[in-house]
Amino acid sequence: MNELIFLVEEALEGGYVARALGQSIFTEAETLEELRAHVRDAVKCHFDADKAPQIIRLHFVRQEVLTN
C-alpha cells in the first residue's frame, strides 16, 4: 500500500476525530498537532514496517447547515 487516507472531522464535544478509509484505524485528539501525531502512531501500530503506507493523507470534512 502506497497511500492511506484519513477522513478528519471536528468532534461534537470538541477536538478532532480521524478514521482511515479501508482500514480499521480510528483516533482522536484535542488539537490538529496532536491528531497528526496520533495518526502516525496508529498507522505504525497497525502495519508491519515493510507494509506501512509511504503517504498518509488527511482529508478534512466540515459540514455546515444553512437555513432560511
Outline where the language-model segments fall.
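Residue-level signal for pocket-adjacent positions within structured domains
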Residues: 20-21, 51
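Short, charged, surface-exposed hinge/linker loops at domain edges
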Residues: 1-5, 33-68
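Structural detector for hydrophobic anchor residues on beta-strands
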Residues: 4, 16, 25-27
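A short, exposed loop/beta-hairpin motif centered on an aromatic-Gly-Thr core
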Residues: 23-33
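Short secondary-structure boundary micro-motifs
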Residues: 1-2, 9-11, 29
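Short aromatic-glycine-(Arg/Gly/Cys) micro-motifs in beta-strand/loop hairpins
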Residues: 8-20
